[in-house]
UniProtKB/Swiss-Prot annotation:
Name of this chain's protein: Protein 4.2
Compositionally biased spans, kind Polar residues: 70-92
Region (Disordered): 64-93
Pfam families to which the protein is assigned, alphabetical: DUF5480 (PF17576)
Length: 112
C-alpha cells in the first residue's frame, strides 16, 4: 500500500487537472466556466482529503514504540511492571534508604 499510494495520488492529480482543462474547453461563458472550475476543485480536494484521512487512519503505528502511540506503550509497560512487583508499602526505613548515609547525622540536628 505504501508504494502504491503515491502513484494513485499522482494519477488522481493528473486526472483532476485534465478535467479542469476539459472544463475550460467547454463553449460556455467565463462566469459559467469559473463556477464549474470552483465546484470541481471543491469536489476534487474533498475527495483527496478523504483519501488521505482514510490512509492515515489505517496506517500501522504499532511497529515502532517511539511512534504516535508511545505514551500508550509506556503506560502498558508501567502497568505490567506494577502488576509483577506487587503493591509496595512505604516505611520510614525505605524512605531513609533513598537519602545519603550522612543524612542520619544531620537528621537529629534539625528540629522537626
Amino acid at each position: 500500500m505504501r508504494k502504491v499510494a503515491p502513484f494513485l495520488l499522482l494519477t488522481y492529480v493528473v486526472l483532476a487537472h485534465y478535467a479542469n482543462y476539459l472544463i475550460l474547453l467547454l463553449p460556455l461563458s467565463v462566469i459559467s466556466k469559473a463556477i464549474c472550475l470552483t465546484l470541481s476543485s471543491f469536489v476534487f480536494s474533498s475527495a483527496a482529503l478523504l483519501v488521505i484521512l482514510v490512509s492515515l487512519a489505517t496506517w500501522n503505528t504499532t511497529r515502532k514504540p517511539d511512534g504516535l502511540n508511545h505514551q500508550v506503550t509506556q503506560g502498558k509497560k508501567s502497568h505490567t511492571q506494577s502488576q509483577q512487583t506487587g503493591p509496595t508499602t512505604l516505611t520510614s526505613d525505605r524512605i531513609l534508604d533513598d537519602f545519603p548515609d550522612d543524612y542520619e547525622k544531620f537528621r537529629w540536628r534539625v528540629p522537626f
